[in-house]
Protein backbone atom coordinates (compact mmCIF):
# COMPACT_ATOMS: atom_id res chain seq x y z
CA UNK A 1 0.00 0.00 0.00
CA UNK A 2 2.94 2.34 0.66
CA UNK A 3 4.12 1.82 -2.95
CA UNK A 4 0.65 2.62 -4.26
CA UNK A 5 0.49 5.76 -2.12
CA UNK A 6 3.76 6.92 -3.67
CA UNK A 7 2.84 6.11 -7.27
CA UNK A 8 -0.72 7.44 -7.26
CA UNK A 9 0.31 11.13 -6.86
CA UNK A 10 2.80 10.63 -9.69
CA UNK A 11 0.11 9.25 -11.97
CA UNK A 12 -2.26 12.06 -11.07
CA UNK A 13 0.50 14.59 -11.77
CA UNK A 14 1.11 12.94 -15.13
CA UNK A 15 -2.53 13.56 -16.03
CA UNK A 16 -1.62 17.24 -16.21
CA UNK A 17 0.94 16.32 -18.89
CA UNK A 18 -1.68 14.39 -20.85
CA UNK A 19 -0.56 13.63 -24.40
CA UNK A 20 2.89 15.23 -24.13
CA UNK A 21 4.73 12.28 -25.63
CA UNK A 22 3.52 11.07 -29.02
CA UNK A 23 2.35 7.47 -29.33
CA UNK A 24 5.10 5.96 -31.43
CA UNK A 25 6.28 6.97 -34.89
CA UNK A 26 2.89 8.31 -35.92
CA UNK A 27 0.80 8.80 -32.81
CA UNK A 28 -2.85 7.98 -32.50
CA UNK A 29 -5.00 10.84 -31.31
CA UNK A 30 -6.09 10.70 -27.72
CA UNK A 31 -8.17 12.76 -25.37
CA UNK A 32 -8.15 13.21 -21.64
CA UNK A 33 -10.71 11.61 -19.36
CA UNK A 34 -12.48 14.89 -18.68
CA UNK A 35 -13.36 15.23 -22.35
CA UNK A 36 -16.02 12.56 -22.07
CA UNK A 37 -18.06 14.47 -19.53
CA UNK A 38 -19.35 16.73 -22.30
CA UNK A 39 -21.46 14.04 -23.98
CA UNK A 40 -25.13 14.95 -23.58
CA UNK A 41 -28.14 12.61 -23.80
CA UNK A 42 -31.37 14.36 -24.68
CA UNK A 43 -34.92 13.04 -24.36
CA UNK A 44 -35.54 13.91 -28.02
CA UNK A 45 -32.96 11.53 -29.46
CA UNK A 46 -29.74 9.58 -29.09
CA UNK A 47 -26.56 10.88 -27.54
CA UNK A 48 -25.17 13.95 -29.27
CA UNK A 49 -21.58 14.18 -30.43
CA UNK A 50 -19.39 16.23 -28.16
CA UNK A 51 -18.08 19.64 -29.13
CA UNK A 52 -14.62 20.09 -30.61
CA UNK A 53 -11.95 21.01 -28.09
CA UNK A 54 -8.51 22.60 -28.22
CA UNK A 55 -5.50 21.87 -26.06
CA UNK A 56 -1.95 23.18 -26.36
CA UNK A 57 1.13 22.58 -24.27
CA UNK A 58 4.93 22.23 -24.33
CA UNK A 59 6.42 18.79 -23.78
CA UNK A 60 9.68 16.86 -23.72
CA UNK A 61 10.03 13.70 -25.78
CA UNK A 62 12.83 11.51 -27.10
CA UNK A 63 14.63 11.73 -30.44
CA UNK A 64 16.83 8.70 -31.28
CA UNK A 65 20.50 9.68 -30.85
CA UNK A 66 19.63 13.41 -30.93
CA UNK A 67 18.89 13.84 -27.23
CA UNK A 68 15.67 15.23 -25.74
CA UNK A 69 13.16 16.86 -28.06
CA UNK A 70 11.74 20.13 -26.74
CA UNK A 71 8.41 20.62 -28.47
CA UNK A 72 5.05 22.36 -28.48
CA UNK A 73 1.75 20.83 -29.53
CA UNK A 74 -1.65 22.17 -30.55
CA UNK A 75 -4.40 19.53 -30.50
CA UNK A 76 -7.91 20.22 -31.87
CA UNK A 77 -10.18 17.21 -31.46
CA UNK A 78 -13.70 15.88 -31.06
CA UNK A 79 -13.85 13.34 -28.21
CA UNK A 80 -15.57 10.03 -28.85
CA UNK A 81 -18.07 8.37 -26.56
CA UNK A 82 -16.41 6.73 -23.58
CA UNK A 83 -17.44 3.23 -24.70
CA UNK A 84 -16.06 3.63 -28.23
CA UNK A 85 -13.02 1.77 -29.58
CA UNK A 86 -11.19 5.05 -30.12
CA UNK A 87 -10.79 8.11 -27.92
CA UNK A 88 -11.46 10.76 -30.57
CA UNK A 89 -13.82 10.86 -33.54
CA UNK A 90 -11.34 13.13 -35.31
CA UNK A 91 -8.36 15.32 -34.48
CA UNK A 92 -5.95 17.84 -35.95
CA UNK A 93 -2.52 17.83 -34.29
CA UNK A 94 0.39 20.19 -34.98
CA UNK A 95 3.82 19.72 -33.39
CA UNK A 96 7.07 21.68 -33.62
CA UNK A 97 10.26 20.78 -31.78
CA UNK A 98 14.04 21.13 -31.58
CA UNK A 99 16.88 19.16 -29.99
CA UNK A 100 20.06 20.51 -28.34
CA UNK A 101 22.15 19.00 -31.16
CA UNK A 102 20.34 20.87 -33.90
CA UNK A 103 17.60 18.44 -34.85
CA UNK A 104 14.19 19.90 -35.59
CA UNK A 105 10.78 18.83 -36.78
CA UNK A 106 7.39 20.20 -37.75
CA UNK A 107 4.44 17.85 -38.25
CA UNK A 108 0.74 18.34 -38.95
CA UNK A 109 -1.63 15.36 -38.66
CA UNK A 110 -5.30 14.74 -39.22
CA UNK A 111 -6.99 11.54 -38.08
CA UNK A 112 -10.69 10.75 -38.41
CA UNK A 113 -11.35 7.14 -37.36
CA UNK A 114 -15.11 7.59 -37.00
CA UNK A 115 -16.12 11.02 -38.18
CA UNK A 116 -17.92 9.47 -41.17
CA UNK A 117 -19.82 6.20 -41.14
CA UNK A 118 -17.78 3.28 -42.57
CA UNK A 119 -14.86 5.56 -43.50
CA UNK A 120 -11.53 6.42 -41.86
CA UNK A 121 -9.04 9.07 -42.98
CA UNK A 122 -5.49 9.79 -41.83
CA UNK A 123 -3.07 12.33 -43.25
CA UNK A 124 0.35 13.67 -42.35
CA UNK A 125 2.67 16.44 -43.55
CA UNK A 126 6.12 16.66 -41.98
CA UNK A 127 9.57 18.21 -42.18
CA UNK A 128 12.14 16.46 -39.98
CA UNK A 129 15.89 16.95 -39.59
CA UNK A 130 17.88 14.38 -37.59
CA UNK A 131 21.56 15.13 -36.96
CA UNK A 132 22.58 11.78 -35.44
CA UNK A 133 20.59 9.27 -37.49
CA UNK A 134 22.04 5.77 -37.18
CA UNK A 135 23.44 4.00 -40.24
CA UNK A 136 25.02 0.57 -39.75
CA UNK A 137 25.13 -0.72 -43.32
CA UNK A 138 22.86 -2.83 -45.51
CA UNK A 139 22.17 -6.50 -44.96
CA UNK A 140 21.79 -9.02 -42.17
CA UNK A 141 25.49 -9.47 -41.36
CA UNK A 142 26.45 -5.88 -40.58
CA UNK A 143 28.62 -5.43 -37.49
CA UNK A 144 28.37 -2.74 -34.81
CA UNK A 145 31.66 -2.30 -32.94
CA UNK A 146 31.37 0.28 -30.17
CA UNK A 147 35.15 0.19 -29.67
CA UNK A 148 35.60 1.56 -33.19
CA UNK A 149 33.84 4.79 -32.18
CA UNK A 150 36.72 7.00 -31.01
CA UNK A 151 37.44 10.74 -30.69
CA UNK A 152 39.00 10.54 -34.16
CA UNK A 153 35.85 9.01 -35.68
CA UNK A 154 32.95 9.82 -33.32
CA UNK A 155 30.33 9.60 -36.08
CA UNK A 156 31.30 6.23 -37.53
CA UNK A 157 27.66 5.04 -37.37
CA UNK A 158 25.92 8.40 -37.72
CA UNK A 159 24.64 10.58 -40.57
CA UNK A 160 22.40 13.63 -40.94
CA UNK A 161 19.00 12.95 -42.44
CA UNK A 162 16.37 15.45 -43.58
CA UNK A 163 12.90 14.24 -44.64
CA UNK A 164 10.09 16.26 -46.20
CA UNK A 165 6.84 14.78 -47.32
CA UNK A 166 3.30 13.76 -46.64
CA UNK A 167 0.75 11.01 -46.95
CA UNK A 168 -2.98 10.43 -46.98
CA UNK A 169 -4.74 7.15 -46.28
CA UNK A 170 -8.43 6.37 -46.76
CA UNK A 171 -10.00 3.24 -45.29
CA UNK A 172 -13.47 1.92 -46.12
CA UNK A 173 -15.37 -0.74 -44.20
CA UNK A 174 -16.35 -3.56 -46.55
CA UNK A 175 -18.20 -5.99 -44.33
CA UNK A 176 -18.00 -6.65 -40.61
CA UNK A 177 -14.37 -6.31 -39.48
CA UNK A 178 -13.00 -6.40 -43.05
CA UNK A 179 -11.73 -3.10 -44.47
CA UNK A 180 -9.84 -1.87 -47.54
CA UNK A 181 -7.22 0.87 -47.24
CA UNK A 182 -5.57 3.01 -49.92
CA UNK A 183 -2.42 5.02 -49.13
CA UNK A 184 -0.69 7.75 -51.16
CA UNK A 185 2.76 8.89 -50.07
CA UNK A 186 5.40 11.38 -51.28
CA UNK A 187 8.80 12.05 -49.71
CA UNK A 188 12.10 13.81 -50.35
CA UNK A 189 15.10 12.62 -48.31
CA UNK A 190 18.63 14.04 -48.05
CA UNK A 191 21.49 12.34 -46.22
CA UNK A 192 24.67 14.33 -45.47
CA UNK A 193 27.73 13.08 -43.61
CA UNK A 194 29.12 14.43 -40.36
CA UNK A 195 32.81 15.35 -39.82
CA UNK A 196 35.30 12.49 -39.90
CA UNK A 197 35.11 8.94 -41.25
CA UNK A 198 31.76 7.18 -41.34
CA UNK A 199 30.27 4.00 -42.70
CA UNK A 200 27.74 6.04 -44.66
CA UNK A 201 30.47 8.12 -46.36
CA UNK A 202 32.33 4.96 -47.35
CA UNK A 203 29.15 3.55 -48.91
CA UNK A 204 27.49 6.57 -50.55
CA UNK A 205 29.88 9.52 -50.40
CA UNK A 206 29.25 12.82 -48.62
CA UNK A 207 25.64 13.24 -49.78
CA UNK A 208 22.69 11.19 -51.00
CA UNK A 209 19.42 12.67 -52.26
CA UNK A 210 16.30 10.59 -52.83
CA UNK A 211 12.70 11.19 -53.84
CA UNK A 212 9.83 8.74 -53.77
CA UNK A 213 6.16 8.72 -54.72
CA UNK A 214 4.30 5.56 -53.79
CA UNK A 215 0.87 4.02 -53.46
CA UNK A 216 -0.24 1.12 -51.32
CA UNK A 217 -3.44 -0.89 -51.11
CA UNK A 218 -4.21 -3.21 -48.20
CA UNK A 219 -6.92 -5.43 -46.77
CA UNK A 220 -7.38 -5.11 -43.01
CA UNK A 221 -9.25 -7.44 -40.64
CA UNK A 222 -9.77 -5.81 -37.23
CA UNK A 223 -11.61 -7.38 -34.28
CA UNK A 224 -9.79 -5.56 -31.44
CA UNK A 225 -11.82 -4.57 -28.40
CA UNK A 226 -10.29 -1.08 -28.53
CA UNK A 227 -7.44 0.66 -30.34
CA UNK A 228 -5.67 2.49 -27.51
CA UNK A 229 -5.07 -0.36 -25.01
CA UNK A 230 -6.01 -3.63 -26.70
CA UNK A 231 -6.80 -6.68 -24.55
CA UNK A 232 -8.27 -9.10 -27.07
CA UNK A 233 -8.85 -9.52 -30.76
CA UNK A 234 -6.99 -9.69 -34.06
CA UNK A 235 -5.51 -7.06 -36.35
CA UNK A 236 -4.50 -8.71 -39.63
CA UNK A 237 -3.39 -6.93 -42.78
CA UNK A 238 -1.85 -7.70 -46.13
CA UNK A 239 -0.95 -5.26 -48.86
CA UNK A 240 1.09 -4.29 -51.87
CA UNK A 241 3.02 -1.10 -52.60
CA UNK A 242 4.39 0.45 -55.80
CA UNK A 243 7.01 3.21 -55.56
CA UNK A 244 8.92 5.45 -57.96
CA UNK A 245 12.06 5.81 -55.82
CA UNK A 246 15.36 4.53 -57.16
CA UNK A 247 14.58 2.88 -60.47
CA UNK A 248 11.15 1.89 -59.16
CA UNK A 249 10.16 -0.83 -56.74
CA UNK A 250 7.33 -2.99 -55.52
CA UNK A 251 6.56 -4.48 -52.11
CA UNK A 252 4.33 -7.26 -50.80
CA UNK A 253 3.80 -7.50 -47.06
CA UNK A 254 1.69 -8.85 -44.24
CA UNK A 255 1.42 -7.90 -40.57
CA UNK A 256 -0.49 -10.26 -38.27
CA UNK A 257 -1.25 -9.23 -34.68
CA UNK A 258 -3.19 -11.05 -31.97
CA UNK A 259 -4.14 -10.24 -28.37
CA UNK A 260 -5.37 -12.70 -25.74
CA UNK A 261 -6.37 -11.97 -22.12
CA UNK A 262 -4.82 -14.57 -19.81
CA UNK A 263 -6.47 -13.31 -16.64
CA UNK A 264 -7.71 -10.02 -15.24
CA UNK A 265 -5.00 -7.45 -15.98
CA UNK A 266 -2.75 -9.81 -17.98
CA UNK A 267 -2.56 -9.87 -21.78
CA UNK A 268 -0.46 -11.95 -24.17
CA UNK A 269 0.28 -10.33 -27.54
CA UNK A 270 2.05 -11.58 -30.65
CA UNK A 271 2.99 -10.14 -34.03
CA UNK A 272 4.40 -11.58 -37.25
CA UNK A 273 5.77 -9.31 -39.99
CA UNK A 274 6.89 -10.45 -43.44
CA UNK A 275 7.79 -8.18 -46.33
CA UNK A 276 9.54 -8.54 -49.67
CA UNK A 277 10.60 -5.86 -52.17
CA UNK A 278 11.34 -6.08 -55.88
CA UNK A 279 13.09 -3.65 -58.20
CA UNK A 280 15.47 -0.96 -56.95
CA UNK A 281 14.10 0.72 -53.79
CA UNK A 282 15.62 3.80 -52.22
CA UNK A 283 17.70 3.53 -49.08
CA UNK A 284 14.98 5.19 -47.01
CA UNK A 285 12.30 2.82 -48.35
CA UNK A 286 14.28 -0.02 -46.78
CA UNK A 287 13.97 1.61 -43.36
CA UNK A 288 10.17 1.49 -42.99
CA UNK A 289 7.23 -0.78 -43.68
CA UNK A 290 4.06 1.19 -44.61
CA UNK A 291 1.64 -0.70 -42.37
CA UNK A 292 -1.96 0.41 -41.93
CA UNK A 293 -2.17 3.92 -40.43
CA UNK A 294 1.41 3.66 -39.19
CA UNK A 295 4.97 2.84 -40.20
CA UNK A 296 7.04 0.04 -38.69
CA UNK A 297 10.76 0.93 -38.44
CA UNK A 298 12.83 -1.94 -39.85
CA UNK A 299 14.74 -3.44 -38.11
CA UNK A 300 15.45 -2.35 -34.54
CA UNK A 301 14.13 -0.01 -31.88
CA UNK A 302 11.18 0.09 -29.47
CA UNK A 303 8.60 -0.59 -32.21
CA UNK A 304 10.23 -3.57 -33.96
CA UNK A 305 13.25 -5.34 -32.34
CA UNK A 306 13.91 -3.95 -28.88
CA UNK A 307 17.34 -5.54 -28.39
CA UNK A 308 18.81 -3.34 -31.17
CA UNK A 309 19.28 0.35 -31.90
CA UNK A 310 16.64 1.98 -34.08
CA UNK A 311 16.93 0.66 -37.66
CA UNK A 312 20.02 -1.38 -36.77
CA UNK A 313 19.47 -3.64 -39.82
CA UNK A 314 18.12 -2.67 -43.24
CA UNK A 315 17.38 -4.73 -46.32
CA UNK A 316 14.93 -5.27 -49.18
CA UNK A 317 13.11 -8.05 -47.32
CA UNK A 318 12.34 -8.54 -43.63
CA UNK A 319 11.02 -11.27 -41.35
CA UNK A 320 10.07 -10.32 -37.78
CA UNK A 321 8.27 -11.95 -34.87
CA UNK A 322 7.36 -10.53 -31.45
CA UNK A 323 5.80 -12.12 -28.38
CA UNK A 324 5.10 -10.26 -25.16
CA UNK A 325 3.12 -10.48 -21.94
CA UNK A 326 1.72 -7.38 -20.24
CA UNK A 327 0.68 -7.59 -16.59
CA UNK A 328 -0.90 -4.70 -14.69
CA UNK A 329 1.11 -4.65 -11.47
CA UNK A 330 -0.66 -1.58 -10.11
CA UNK A 331 -4.04 -1.04 -11.78
CA UNK A 332 -5.76 2.27 -11.02
CA UNK A 333 -8.90 1.69 -13.06
CA UNK A 334 -9.68 4.61 -15.35
CA UNK A 335 -6.76 6.57 -13.90
CA UNK A 336 -4.24 4.24 -15.57
CA UNK A 337 -1.86 1.48 -14.56
CA UNK A 338 1.75 0.51 -13.96
CA UNK A 339 2.38 -2.54 -16.15
CA UNK A 340 5.21 -5.07 -16.24
CA UNK A 341 6.43 -6.33 -19.63
CA UNK A 342 8.22 -9.49 -20.70
CA UNK A 343 9.06 -9.89 -24.39
CA UNK A 344 10.95 -11.87 -26.99
CA UNK A 345 11.83 -10.38 -30.39
CA UNK A 346 13.32 -12.27 -33.34
CA UNK A 347 13.98 -11.13 -36.88
CA UNK A 348 16.31 -10.66 -39.81
CA UNK A 349 16.61 -8.81 -43.11
CA UNK A 350 17.53 -10.05 -46.58
CA UNK A 351 19.43 -7.98 -49.14
CA UNK A 352 21.38 -10.14 -51.62
CA UNK A 353 19.06 -13.13 -51.31
CA UNK A 354 15.40 -13.88 -51.80
CA UNK A 355 12.91 -13.71 -48.95
CA UNK A 356 12.20 -17.01 -47.26
CA UNK A 357 10.73 -18.33 -44.03
CA UNK A 358 13.78 -19.52 -42.13
CA UNK A 359 15.48 -19.55 -38.74
CA UNK A 360 18.95 -19.14 -40.26
CA UNK A 361 20.44 -15.77 -39.48
CA UNK A 362 17.55 -14.73 -37.25
CA UNK A 363 18.61 -12.29 -34.52
CA UNK A 364 16.97 -13.18 -31.20
CA UNK A 365 16.73 -10.92 -28.19
CA UNK A 366 14.47 -10.39 -25.24
CA UNK A 367 13.97 -8.69 -21.95
CA UNK A 368 11.47 -6.90 -19.82
CA UNK A 369 10.23 -3.47 -19.03
CA UNK A 370 7.75 -1.19 -17.34
CA UNK A 371 4.86 0.68 -18.92
CA UNK A 372 2.96 3.58 -17.40
CA UNK A 373 -0.55 4.21 -18.71
CA UNK A 374 -2.16 7.57 -17.94
CA UNK A 375 -5.96 7.52 -18.29
CA UNK A 376 -6.87 6.58 -21.87
CA UNK A 377 -4.46 9.11 -23.29
CA UNK A 378 -0.81 8.06 -23.00
CA UNK A 379 1.28 4.92 -22.61
CA UNK A 380 5.01 5.20 -21.93
CA UNK A 381 7.19 2.07 -22.17
CA UNK A 382 10.71 1.58 -20.81
CA UNK A 383 12.42 -1.47 -22.32
CA UNK A 384 15.49 -3.32 -21.03
CA UNK A 385 16.70 -5.88 -23.55
CA UNK A 386 19.66 -8.06 -24.38
CA UNK A 387 20.70 -9.55 -27.70
CA UNK A 388 23.59 -10.04 -30.13
CA UNK A 389 24.74 -6.42 -29.68
CA UNK A 390 24.57 -6.64 -25.88
CA UNK A 391 22.34 -4.62 -23.59
CA UNK A 392 19.94 -2.09 -25.11
CA UNK A 393 17.63 0.38 -23.37
CA UNK A 394 14.82 2.08 -25.26
CA UNK A 395 11.82 4.27 -24.52
CA UNK A 396 8.59 4.07 -26.47
CA UNK A 397 5.36 6.04 -26.63
CA UNK A 398 2.58 3.50 -26.86
CA UNK A 399 2.83 -0.27 -27.07
CA UNK A 400 5.37 -1.82 -29.43
CA UNK A 401 2.42 -3.18 -31.45
Give the location of each predicted region.
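Outer-membrane beta-barrel initiation region
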Residues: 20-123, 127, 179-183, 191-198, ...
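Transmembrane beta-barrel strands of outer-membrane/channel proteins
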Residues: 58-62, 72, 92-98, 121-131, ...
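Residues on the lipid-exposed face of transmembrane beta-strands in outer-membrane beta-barrel proteins
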Residues: 58-60, 72-76, 108-112, 166-172, ...
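Extracellular loop and loop/strand-boundary signature of outer-membrane beta-barrel proteins
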Residues: 93-95, 151-156, 200-206, 239-244, ...
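Outer-membrane beta-barrel translocator/channel fold
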Residues: 97, 101-166, 270-314, 380, ...
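Outer-membrane beta-barrel transmembrane strands
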Residues: 106-112, 152-188, 226-234, 246-248, ...
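Flexible, surface-exposed loop regions and adjacent strand-edge segments
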Residues: 128, 138-145, 197-203, 255, ...
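C-terminal outer-membrane beta-barrel translocator/porin domains of Gram-negative envelope proteins
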Residues: 208, 215-335
